[in-house]
């Protein structure tokens, strides 16, 4: 499950390292990561009775965590890759449907109409790569980057995902705070390298608290910034391989 403003193409290296696994990467440009569980499951295209291993990066971590906590019988293994924290609840006036959200959406539509994303979108993508990855190696072709990040409605899509992630974080926070009857084996990968080093202490503490609540394990990645799937795809693949055999991985 990708994170905010990410694409399925970015996870190609992880998929390549798992040739014996049935890996499904949901496309956030078609199905918002903050969608309900039924929508996400349909987007993954897995059989209704299939038992899953779920992997989520950034806000995708919140999405798979909600899935695992609300439907524990469907999930056999959970991997959170530098997941957003349940404390990242944003500002309520900007939650979906609230006045702030409506104002930002109107602005994003206007910028799309006058061509701002079309001109600046690919540059924003390059900035994301520079700040979020130590390797800085972008797996997207220029054409794909232009199509996705230079799309008229791309900034509206990014905002909708961000605002939706705040609401999702608030929901998952309540789930984590409540007594947890059942949770699948959970692994957390935490990036503290590159630009992530500036907030590493607090970030790692938050991730450890989340791991404690889930009875999960934490692996710290000092050689990776936030975009772990670009810097350390091998670490993600190795953690996934510890999952129960013959699982669908979404």
Where in this protein do the model-derived segments appear?
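Conserved HGGG/HGGXW glycine-rich cap/lid loop of the alpha/beta-hydrolase fold
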Residues: 1-32, 70
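Short N-terminal helix/helix-N-cap motif within the alpha/beta-hydrolase-1
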Residues: 8-10, 33-34, 88-89, 229
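Active-site loop/oxyanion-hole signature of alpha/beta-hydrolase fold enzymes
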Residues: 24-55, 59, 63-66, 71, ...
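Residue in the alpha/beta-hydrolase core beta-strand immediately N-terminal to the catalytic nucleophile
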Residues: 53, 76-79
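Flexible "cap/lid" loop of the alpha/beta hydrolase fold
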Residues: 78-116
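Conserved serine/cysteine hydrolase catalytic core
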Residues: 146-220
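Post-His helix in hydrolase/transferase enzymes
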Residues: 214, 230-242
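Catalytic histidine-centered segment of alpha/beta-hydrolase-like enzymes
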Residues: 221-233
